[in-house]
Amino acid sequence: MRLFSLLLVSLLYLANLPALAAGDVSHSTPSVAERLTDARKYIDTKNWSRAAFELDKAVREEPKNADVYNMLGFYNRKKPNADLPKAFENYNMALKLDPKHRAAHEYLGEAYLMDKKPAEAEKLLANLEVLCGNKNCEEYKDLAEAIAKYKAGQ
């Protein structure tokens, strides 16, 4: 009986060797979508260096991903000493990669408001109405609200 138990334990151990050799799979590399989610959290908490790290990794991993460039634009617009020229470049790249990217239209419009160009923001609002098919999508509502606040502050 003792020999049988020893054999059983040995067989179970040997059966798990490939899994042990593969290492701990719980430490896998984050996907670009996960990096963008993390970057947004870091931006929201003003952890600019971590946001920049995640975005740098994301753009290296998927250089043709419109969501990556949209988030880069958001980062460059929101960080201290906003870099609007870089934000415009990022948003325009997102729209080049995906002309129907609604968030890029919204955020580019908000960047134009920061640059005191409300007419450009209103053009993007009109684009959003077409892309959304109505005035009820979140991106349209957010940009419309930002334009209204901008005009009220004038």
Question: What are these regions, as identified by a protein language model?
Answer:
Residues 30-60:
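Alpha-helical segment of the N-proximal tetratricopeptide repeat
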Residues 45-53, 80-93, 116-124:
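Structural signature of tandem alpha-helical TPR/SEL1-like repeats
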